């Protein structure tokens, strides 16, 4: 896989912003088939920084019920499962897109 196929998007939330500022951790949504080595290599190639470590989390899908305007359930479905990567960088390194 290429680097652009591995890194899907950055995660920008209040929690990830505080982690980025305090302990220099960046959070990304990544391809479900990617492993730690591939994610680290993609970060190094795309952003020119060297990751110290990388943790991956599999986020399971959740069941959802589609409700009509009157409040009656009209269908069932589920969200997609996806993978999240926590990338730890050195204190002097920084990714500029954030």
Curated annotation (Swiss-Prot):
One of its GO terms (biological process) is translation. GO terms for cellular component: ribonucleoprotein complex; ribosome. SUPFAM superfamilies: Ribosomal proteins S24e, L23 and L15e (SSF54189). Part of the 50S ribosomal subunit. Contacts protein L29, and trigger factor when it is bound to the ribosome. The keyword rRNA-binding applies. Keywords: Ribonucleoprotein, Ribosomal protein, RNA-binding, rRNA-binding. Pfam families: Ribosomal_L23. One of the early assembly proteins it binds 23S rRNA. One of the proteins that surrounds the polypeptide exit tunnel on the outside of the ribosome. Forms the main docking site for trigger factor binding to the ribosome. It comes from Borrelia garinii subsp. bavariensis (strain ATCC BAA-2496 / DSM 23469 / PBi) (Borreliella bavariensis). GO terms for molecular function: rRNA binding; structural constituent of ribosome. This is Large ribosomal subunit protein uL23. Belongs to the universal ribosomal protein uL23 family.
């Amino acid at each position: 896989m290429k680097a652009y196929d591995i890194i899907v998007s950055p995660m920008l939330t209040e929690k990830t912003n505080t982690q980025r500022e305090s302990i220099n951790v960046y959070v990304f949504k990544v391809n479900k088939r990617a492993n730690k080595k591939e994610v680290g290599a993609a970060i190094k190639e795309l952003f020119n920084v060297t990751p110290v470590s990388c943790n991956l989390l599999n986020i399971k899908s959740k069941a959802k019920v589609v409700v009509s305007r009157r409040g009656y359930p009209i269908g069932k479905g589920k969200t997609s499962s996806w993978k999240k990567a926590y990338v730890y960088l050195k204190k002097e390194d920084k990714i500029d897109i954030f």
